[in-house]
Structures are given as structure tokens and as C-alpha cells.
């Protein structure tokens, strides 16, 4: 993944055609109407995500954007799809990272939600990034347990990604978690296994991630 390039012009034309500026969240993020995670973003089917160099992007830098999909955070995905994502990609390139590869994660609450983790792909192209962003299920869940499962983003980044920037250049990738709650401090082994569909060695917490 990540072999195409970002075109602000083509993105602008496509956004106008798709009606991003005027449509509602449920019309843009269509999984909200389905009320379920898109099968391509099931974490049990995303046991490894790769960020690789290519002729088009010889110095790839992986960037994970973890979006809180609970009820209070609806405005962030809407801002990204309407204007924030093109500006963000442009700013990243202007700051000296010409080959960004962005992966969207949806993060909720593993104690309450049906889809506490959703996983896209590392992409560079405007069309592909829009696809994964708008495919995210805005579950609008969460509970009164004092936090959300932002640790799931950290767990996935640490255990289920491979990247040429690290293997070839010793450079770490970037993880950005966007939320408005405290993070739950632990991920029980049983919860991780249920979400990822595989055996894991143990629980995870703030201290060992």
C-alpha cells in the first residue's frame, strides 16, 4: 500500500462531486447506517499493516491517525473529510516529509463498544485516504467508565505494523491519537484476544507499551 500520490486538485474535485461540504455524517460515513464495522477494517483481518518504500515514495514515513469514534467526537472525522485532511497532508509535506503514508484507526471503548478498534491501510493517495476515512464506522458509543481505549492504537502500532523507515533507516513512525477523554490504563489479555482474534501473551498497560 502507499504507492499512489496525493493530489489536492483531484481531491477537491472529488469532494465537490461527493458533496462532502453539505452531506450529513451518516451520508458520508455510510457504515453509520449499517451500524457495524466495515469488513475490510476488522482487526482480526488486519494482523499486519505495512509501510514500504517505492519508486514513487522512496523515503516513506508511516503516520497512524487514531480517531475516537465515540459519540462526543463526531466533529473530528467530519472536519477531516471536509477540509482537515487535505490541509494536514499538505502541512506534513511542507514540513519536510515528502512521502507520508497515513493509516486511519477507529478507536472506541473495549469495555462497551461493538467495534472498539477499526484498522485501515497505510496510503499516500488522496482517493485511497478518503476511502479508509469514510469507511470508518462512527459507532458513537463509549460508556461511563472514565476513559476510552486509546491504548488499542498503541498496541496495534507496536505489535501489528512493519515499516521500511525503521528497518532501513532506523527512523520511527508517528502515532497521533485524537480524543477527548482519559485513556483506560490497561487492556486485558482476554479483550485483546477477542478483538484481534488471536492468542496474545498477556495484558497490556501504560507501563509496558
For the regions a protein language model found, what residue spans apply to each?
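Acidic, low-complexity intrinsically disordered regions
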Residues: 1-209
Amino acid at each position: 500500500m502507499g504507492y499512489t500520490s496525493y493530489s489536492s486538485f483531484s481531491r477537491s474535485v472529488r469532494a465537490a462531486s461527493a458533496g462532502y461540504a453539505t452531506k450529513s455524517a451518516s451520508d458520508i460515513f455510510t457504515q453509520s447506517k449499517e451500524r457495524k464495522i466495515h469488513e475490510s477494517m476488522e482487526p482480526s483481518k488486519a494482523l499486519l499493516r505495512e509501510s514500504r518504500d517505492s519508486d514513487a515514495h522512496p523515503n516513506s514515513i508511516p503516520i497512524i491517525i487514531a480517531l475516537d469514534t465515540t459519540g462526543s467526537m463526531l466533529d473530528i472525522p467530519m472536519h477531516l473529510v471536509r477540509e482537515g485532511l487535505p490541509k494536514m497532508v499538505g502541512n506534513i509535506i511542507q514540513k519536510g516529509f515528502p512521502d507520508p503514508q497515513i493509516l486511519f484507526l477507529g478507536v472506541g471503548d473495549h469495555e462497551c463498544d461493538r467495534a472498539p478498534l477499526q484498522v485501515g491501510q497505510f496510503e499516500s493517495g488522496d482517493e485511497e485516504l478518503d476511502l479508509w476515512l469514510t469507511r470508518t464506522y462512527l459507532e458513537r458509543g463509549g460508556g461511563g467508565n472514565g476513559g476510552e481505549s486509546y491504548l488499542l492504537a498503541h498496541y496495534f502500532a507496536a505489535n501489528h505494523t512493519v515499516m521500511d523507515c525503521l528497518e532501513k533507516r532506523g527512523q520511527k513512525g508517528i502515532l497521533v491519537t485524537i480524543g477527548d477523554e482519559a485513556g483506560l490504563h490497561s487492556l486485558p489479555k482476554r479483550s485483546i484476544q477477542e478483538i484481534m482474534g488471536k492468542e496474545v501473551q498477556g495484558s497490556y498497560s501504560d507501563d509496558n507499551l
